[in-house]
Amino acid sequence: MALSSWIFFLLVHGIVGGSRTCFPGCRCIVDNFGLFHSFSLTKVDCSRVGPHVVPVSIPLDTSYLDLSSNRLKRINESVLSGPGYTTLMNLNLSYNQIVKISYSTFSKLRYLESLDLSHNLLETLPDGSFLYSRLTELDLSSNKIQKVGVGAFTLKSQGRSMTINLANNEIHSIFRGAERPVPNIHSLMLYGNQLLSVPDLHGIPLRHLNLDRNPLSKIEKVSFLGLESLTHLSLSDLPNLREVSPYSFKSLTSLLELDLSNNPNLKSLSSDMFFGLKALQELNLAYSGVASLPKDIMLHLPSMKSITWGENIRCLKTVKESIFHAQKGRVRKEVLLCHDDNGAVPAQDIL
């Protein structure tokens, strides 16, 4: 049984224990598990101790280490190795002043699943930065990163999918870099960066992608090719967005939710823009500049359930049956029923 699965089992059947002697300035909380408390894991909180805290010695059974808010400027392999680091699953290095990591910085943390490097001063990510870990959650938000190579997120064991947060950096380029296996990224947050176009993420098994608050001006026909697994796409708060090309979403056959809200300079949408969105259930166009939708929009959106529109208008799809016809029987027709805070809104005002 994998270590993480065993620990999860113990967490379900365990009870909280007490504290133990800890590194000066740190706090150690022990969780005891098992029928006779025969197994324990320790959470070590060394936040706000100061830069002298590293290297910090930690108990052998440490699963969580918090080194946030310590004004740390560098962190390396020697700091994150030794007794106690073998079982480490969660490491918090947020709110420091770390300017650089290397491909070997986290190489000894073979069971690391969650890493928080947010609110630091990182500018680059070396290829294979996290290669030897078992990461499922990686937070790199609010740094100074400008360019990102996809190879930085390749793991030696590719079986587990990752959630990666790169929000609020200065990213203007995402490139393929060295030949490595495509990283297994499930969710990618890129909001609040400097991307002028949708990056090439071809082949990455993404299900969630957030590109909000970037200076994108146009969605191209090829922008989302190779992202057939995508189910949630957010393109909100794009002040420069003026055009979505026809067939831009044609490869997104699994997409369930599309957010195009708060795009005031997006004035119109063609019916061909919705081509291929057979699974789409929710479309958000709230506070956009689009005055009306194509009349035949529902032909391209057979699974649509709701459209959010204008300032606070929501349209729900329903099936309406006409009067019985001698030859055709009852004819079923899909229609939109719309309402706002004041009540019903005629669908013809929207279509």
Curated annotation (Swiss-Prot):
Cystine pairs: none
Gene3D superfamilies, per the entry: Ribonuclease Inhibitor
Disruption phenotype: Morpholino knockdown causes anterior neural developmental defects. Morpholino knockdown impairs neural crest formation. Morpholino knockdown results in impaired endoderm formation and mesoderm patterning.
Annotated Gene Ontology cellular component terms: extracellular matrix; extracellular space
PROSITE patterns in UniProt: LRR
LRR repeats: 59-82, 85-108, 109-132, 134-155, 158-181, 182-203, 204-226, 252-276, 277-300
Function: Contributes to various developmental events through its interactions with multiple signaling pathways. Dorsalizing factor which functions as an inhibitor of bone morphogenetic proteins (BMP) during gastrulation. Promotes dll1-dependent activation of Notch signaling and is required for neural crest formation. Induces endoderm and dorsal mesoderm formation by enhancing nodal2/Xnr2 activity while inhibiting ventrolateral mesoderm formation through inhibition of fgf8.
Record's protein name: Tsukushi-A
Upper lineage: Eukaryota, Metazoa, Chordata, Craniata, Vertebrata
